[in-house]
Regions:
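Generic solvent-exposed, charged/amphipathic alpha-helical segments
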Residues: 17, 213-217, 257, 261
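C-terminal active-site/capping subdomain that shapes the small-molecule cofactor and substrate pocket
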Residues: 224-261
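Oxyanion-binding "anion nests"
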Residues: 186-237
Length: 261
């Protein structure tokens, strides 16, 4: 099978390449695509060097499945066009709340995957949403979830490479007693917690919190009441979450542990 990755040189694109390298998926050809400034560069995949192609000149019919890992702007501009020639799996937020595009977490709602055929596009959920619904799904099946209160503690990798570099620089400057400047966050991130991710929207939530609330409803159950607080923490990679759940049916800790195990 032929696969392609749009945004192959970014954090998400490189991680996708890494996952495919370790996977058992039989790949005949892998096409790596990025902006013009990255075109011509090479990335090694399974012992071979693959040349980066220019998105503006790329032929989407090359691959059966194309991963979009370049953000919402690129998805908005190119994904629908690409879907005429290839199955699109988009990692950005652009299509997530589109009623005609399935929002898929394979461990949770794989049965909805068949709905991709209408537009030939599959949306991938937000990172913090994914780890929560994977844990909640089996509990919801057994006890019917009524309400969820979640607090997330999200690393700077979720904001991109520049914020990761800023954390390193700020940490070094802080320890050396130098003046700290912030370009990628509203406040200093080194040795600090920032209790909002992205811009504020209705009812005092941030966009990140809004995504968690509404994506979970679309994936799991629209009737679940959800409140979310998302915090950016001075950690390079990996997110963690604290989740309080209220069920419709009586539960006990032993049953929950058995189900999750």
């Amino acid at each position: 099978m032929n696969l392609a990755i749009i945004g192959a040189t970014g954090n998400v694109g490189r991680k996708t390449i890494e996952i495919l390298e370790k996977s058992k998926i039989e790949i005949s050809n892998l096409f790596l695509v990025a902006s013009a400034k990255s075109a011509g560069k090479k990335i090694k995949f399974k012992g071979k060097e693959i040349e980066i192609q220019d998105l503006e000149k790329y032929d989407f019919s090359n691959a059966k499945i194309t991963f979009f890992a370049a953000g919402s702007t690129i998805a908005e501009q190119w994904a629908t066009k690409a879907s005429k020639k290839t199955i699109v799996i988009d990692n950005s937020k652009f299509f997530r709340m589109d009623n005609d595009v399935p929002l898929i977490v394979p461990e949770v709602n794989l049965d909805q995957l068949q709905n991709y055929k209408k537009n030939n596009i599959i949306a991938n959920a937000n990172c913090s949403t994914i780890q929560m619904v994977v844990a909640l799904k089996p509990l919801h099946d057994h006890f019917n979830i009524k309400r969820v209160i979640v607090s997330t503690y999200q690393s700077v990798s979720g904001a991109g490479k520049a914020p990761m570099d800023e954390l390193i620089t700020q940490s070094k400057d802080f320890l050396e007693g130098k003046k700290i400047s912030s370009k990628n966050f509203t406040k200093q991130i080194a040795f600090n917690l920032i209790p909002h991710i992205d811009e504020f929207v209705d009812e005092g939530y941030t966009k990140e919190e809004w995504k968690m609330i509404n994506e979970t409803k679309k994936i799991l159950d629209p009737n679940i009441k959800i409140s979310a607080t998302c915090v950016r923490v001075p950690v390079m990679v990996y997110h963690s979450e604290s989740i309080n759940v209220e069920f419709e049916k009586p539960v006990d800790i032993k049953s929950i542990k058995n189900i999750l195990n």
